[in-house]
Amino acid sequence: MLGSGSTYKYACKITGVVPASKVIKGLSGSTLRLEHRGLGPRGVKALAISLLSNTHVTFLNLEDNWLTAEGGRHIADLLSENYFIKHVNLSNNHLESGGAEALGRMLSNNSALEKVQLSGNHFKDEDAMNLSQGLMNNNQLKELDLSHNEFCEKGGKYFGHMLATNEVLEIFDLSWNHLRMTGAVALCAGLRGNTTLTHLHLAWNGYATEGAVAMAEALKLNSTLVYLDLRKNRIGNHGAEVIANGLEVNETLKTLKLSHNLFDVDGAKALLTSLKKNQMSKLQELDVSTVTVNDAFLRLLETLQDRSGLVVEHGRVTDSPLLRPRPYVEPMRAIEIYLEKNKLRLWEFFHSMDKDGSKRIPIAVFRNMIQESEVRAQTPTVKESLYSTARKKRTAKGGRCSAHHSDYISCTKPPRPPCSARFLNP
């Protein structure tokens, strides 16, 4: 009997492809990684033939090999015979409807696979029917990735019916599809009575308010789900509020991701309020990281600090005292305040910076003085302070300090000590 390597070489000969050394070496290990190799339908046919009797490989990664429906059928035939492969990745292979049909039949018969990745294969609603049928007959598969496909309302109905009857699936990824309206509602209806699913990925769909209402009802009844991702689902304030109603009675969910939706701080506060009401909640992570919050939200969050392990990710705080902008003070008035507090006259203020007695102060020196003094805390920018001073504010009896669009401020001493009151309030 030929070994897997010899079988592969023979299969390459009859299919007209060049044997790949990476395949030959990988056939003796438990993991065979052939992603991005451009195998195509013929290349994967030769591989499938060599794997029919292989007992070593348990993980087969064929992502991004342009297998098309034909190649998908070859892999489906292989997996109907080989019961040693536990994990297969067929993502981004243009399998389309022909591949989905073959894989659906395979899932009905295979009792070894535990994880299947089928992301990005242009599957549509009719393909959901074939895949769901296979899943309803499967008693082993624990993890399925169908993200980045094109399932819509009918697809949601098929998968909802599957979830209501499937008793083994634990992780289901339907993110980046088009599940909305009746499809979203049907999927949630199936989730209500499901007793095995723990992780559900639904990010980047279109659940909106209708889907949020259905999900809230599912959260009230489901007792196994621990991870729910609903990011980017057009959920507004009302949707967040009804999900909060579901959280009031849910006792199993640990992670809820709701960022990149449409609700604001009111929706976020409703979620926190529900956690406050539900003393039996197991939630450990709440993601509302794109929601701008306020002090009221933070005060409500403080009341949940006794919840061990709870982490709430939120956006920036708008009206926190630490983030509020200081009230605007006209730059020249800010300098007046500084002079009055330190009992200085304007001339003395500038004279302290005129180290060489030239009566010309480098702008860089003026800038440093502003930044190092209390004036910095009063004025919005050093530049504004500089050019406010540049208005040639005349001191008493002809003294002046003027700034130009150059590198210096010119200072002229008045004939007699200036009256700061008259200068500051001309």
Q: What residue spans do the PLM features occupy?
A:
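Leucine-rich tandem repeat or coiled-coil scaffolds
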Residues: 1-426
